[in-house]
Amino acid sequence: MYESVDVNPFLMMDYYNQSRGCLIPDKMPHPFSSSIRHQHWSGSNHSIETQSTSSEEIVPSPPSPPPPPRIYKPCFVCQDKSSGYHYGVSACEGCKGFFRRSIQKNMVYTCHREKNCIINKVTRNRCQYCRLQKCLEVGMSKESVRNDRNKKKKEEKKPECTENYTLSPDTEQMIDRVRKAHQETFPSLCQLGKYTTSNSSERRVALDVDLWDKFSELSTKCIIKTVEFAKQLPGFTTLTIADQITLLKAACLDILILRICTRYTPEQDTMTFSDGLTLNRTQMHNAGFGPLTDLVFAFANQLLPLEMDDAETGLLSAICLLCGDRQDLEQADKVDVLQEPLLEALKIYVRNRRPHKPHMFPKMLMKITDLRSISAKGAERVITLKMEIPGSMPPLIQEMLENSEGLESSSGAQGSRASATTPGSCSPSLSPNSAQSSPPTQSP
């Protein structure tokens, strides 16, 4: 047997496997071919080295650095920080929105000086006429606004792939029942004969005793009306008495605030109670609202764009009341079951009433969160009022509102009184059965 070893491309050396003799060239290479063989061998070695080197250099390249953030020139109109190019020029969000609204609504402004007001970040809101003129001077395009508006109109005309929101007979009957319950316990603003009082201070004071007496009287009647409203809701009276009282205490202030805010008149910045008494912001503060006043008026302004009718206000009030996450409920699951059809009814009703505003239903539900936040502060206000009023707090107001959910009772005597009436106790003044026999009253 023979083996061979390749020592260069042209020279072969054989040896006998058994004798292991010396390696002897079979034939000496010809001198003429040595240079060619050397070149070929060298080229072969070079080729191998090149391939080896290239294979070692195949490594992943490092990631490229992120592009630097775009930096725009300051707003051409007011020199504020620009958010990009809008309607042809570099502009801030404020000037962009101002120009768009002015063109879309064909606004006509007037300058109260000499039509040469300085427009900058500080003064841009002082003269709308000069601000609009500067927008046009720096090159903002009216046509761009019109094209943008036409584009949005075309998008609105596209058929929407929406769910089928059809009112079933049962749902329609439920909505009618809740609407009727709301209307019977809370007359609308157009049904009232407004009157005002001139015997109050024109500036904010700690407490106007006369206004407080009137306000506390109306609030007591309103609480009774809230109980009457609750009794008419589907399934409410099937709950245990303890759960009915727990729900009423937890949601009463929510419903009171929601109701009074639907009687807000933005032109006069006033609110009207059910007997027609109309109070402005200062009078509401002095009547007992105190630091709660601005929160309530701000919430009333937020309700205006929703344009809620009686059915929607009644359904939202019912959803606030029948909420299974209240503390100390005996049958929380049953309360949730009662709330579900109310949520579905409100969703279908709102979508049918506003087919092109699909986000209106979740916006309404978000108001429940706002109401709870205001109510928590309202319950605290009831406690501080007891130290400001000359006499005692009306018992129904103290019992219903002071123990609102989430409020920690005060220490000492206040704490003992608060703990005396637990959320599940059957207080005669709060009992839905006692409300049934109460005489007809007006709510604020």
From Swiss-Prot:
Induction: By retinoic acid in embryos. GO terms for cellular component: nucleus. Composed of three domains: a modulating N-terminal domain, a DNA-binding domain and a C-terminal ligand-binding domain. The 9aaTAD motif is a transactivation domain present in a large number of yeast and animal transcription factors. Receptor for retinoic acid. Retinoic acid receptors bind as heterodimers to their target response elements in response to their ligands, all-trans or 9-cis retinoic acid, and regulate gene expression in various biological processes. The rar/rxr heterodimers bind to the retinoic acid response elements (RARE) composed of tandem 5'-AGGTCA-3' sites known as DR1-DR5. Required for hindbrain patterning. It comes from Danio rerio. The keyword Metal-binding applies. One of its GO terms (biological process) is retinoic acid receptor signaling pathway. It is found in: Nucleus. Residues 47-58 have a biased composition (Low complexity). A motif (9aaTAD) lies at residues 395-403. Residues 35-67, 402-444 are annotated as: Disordered. One of its GO terms (molecular function) is RNA polymerase II cis-regulatory region sequence-specific DNA binding. This is Retinoic acid receptor alpha-A. InterPro entries: NHR-like_dom_sf, NR_DBD_RAR, NR_LBD_RAR, Nucl_hrmn_rcpt_lig-bd, Nuclear_hrmn_rcpt, Retinoic_acid_rcpt, Znf_hrmn_rcpt, Znf_NHR/GATA. Residues 35-46 have a biased composition (Polar residues). The gene is raraa. Residues 148-169 are annotated as: Hinge. Residues 1-71 are annotated as: Modulating. Heterodimer; with an rxr molecule. Binds DNA preferentially as a rar/rxr heterodimer. Residues 170-404 form the NR LBD domain. In the embryo, zygotic expression largely overlaps that of rarab, with high levels in hindbrain, lateral mesoderm and tail bud. In the adult, strong expression in brain and muscle, weaker expression in ovary, liver and digestive tract. Belongs to the nuclear hormone receptor family. NR1 subfamily. Residues 72-147 bind DNA. A zinc finger (NR C4-type) spans 75-95, 111-130. The lineage of its organism: Eukaryota, Metazoa, Chordata, Craniata, Vertebrata.
